[in-house]
């Protein structure tokens, strides 16, 4: 299972100076990055699951937070509970097709043997 992956978007109010994830310009590009990464997992044939690292962006005012979790756009929602709709839509588009995609990749792999 793949855990704690994310892509940060510069189109947010956060500086994105912490955390190890990739950085892209827009929330739509975050969605494309999610799709690209998960398609690779499905194609590999050896991944049983995955989950996005954070539900909500890092809170830059959080006391005692780990230094890697201070000011980055890692969530599906911002700190005012607004959904990053382009990201969520891209996730939904892939997730509702995950089993069909896994089957398709399996068939392609079997056809190439």
Predicted regions and their residues:
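Conserved, mostly hydrophobic/aromatic
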Residues: 50
């Amino acid at each position: 299972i793949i855990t704690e992956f994310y892509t940060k978007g510069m189109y947010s109010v956060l500086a994105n100076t912490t955390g190890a994830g990739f950085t892209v310009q827009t929330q739509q590009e975050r969605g494309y990055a999610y799709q690209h990464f998960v398609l690779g997992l499905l194609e590999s044939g050896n991944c049983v699951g995955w989950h996005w690292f954070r539900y909500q962006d890092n809170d830059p005012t959080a006391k005692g937070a780990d230094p890697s979790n201070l000011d980055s756009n890692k969530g599906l929602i911002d700190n005012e509970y607004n959904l990053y709709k382009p990201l969520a839509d891209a996730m939904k588009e892939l997730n509702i097709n995950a089993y069909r995609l896994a089957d398709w990749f399996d068939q392609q792999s079997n056809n190439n043997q």
